[in-house]
């Protein structure tokens, strides 16, 4: 019997690409399911003139998606796990975790530049990143940059910044790996909890067994470990807490 599944997603190009990855998996592995994507703009996508800790934290990226789940306008939500609050409502649990893409942060220079100079600030809003960058580049200054990845790259190429710090996973999923000037190893810059992993959120009590083979055990274990570590330290947008776990099972 055919079953319709609606997946909630933010409107940005990266968010839609990530959601389409999940949609393709379901359509390939569960051909009896009809899958649709419901895109929406979140509060975090709209408020761009202030840093996240000034306007309510990472919850601003999930509020509208959570409401769609609760109202049954959607059946799943796809998130970049690093952008999710460390505590999720009991009624809206994380039901699956993707295989982990590259968890590293990266340095991105303006087009045509091959070396980092410090005459302009590095575009970076994360306290986690800034604190670690101050060790790597003590002569650097920093300025807030908000917006989706493509908006940030445009601001960089327009001459507003000497460089950006972004997540490798997002650039790779956008097909923009060539923009990466330098990978920052975890020993240099510890990533955010869950970085590189997609978290799929559903409703408590519903049957999500169709995601069993999508769910990556190593990524799940690392994600839960990292998120628990940050929760214990009461870390959030205003706290420079980082966490990076490795699964030793297959090493």
Label for each model-derived stretch:
Residues 81-84, 169-171:
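Short glycine-rich anion-binding loops that position phosphate/pyrophosphate groups of nucleotides
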Residues 2-41, 46-47, 54, 130, ...:
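Small-molecule-sensing regulatory modules
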Residues 50-74:
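Short, structured active-site "lid" loops
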Residues 81-82, 90-139:
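A conserved helix-loop-strand patch within extracytoplasmic ligand-binding domains
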Residues 61, 79, 165-167:
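Short beta-strand and adjacent tight-turn residues that come in two discontinuous sequence segments
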Residues 74-78, 162-163:
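Short, Asp-centered acidic motifs that coordinate Mg2+ and/or phosphate
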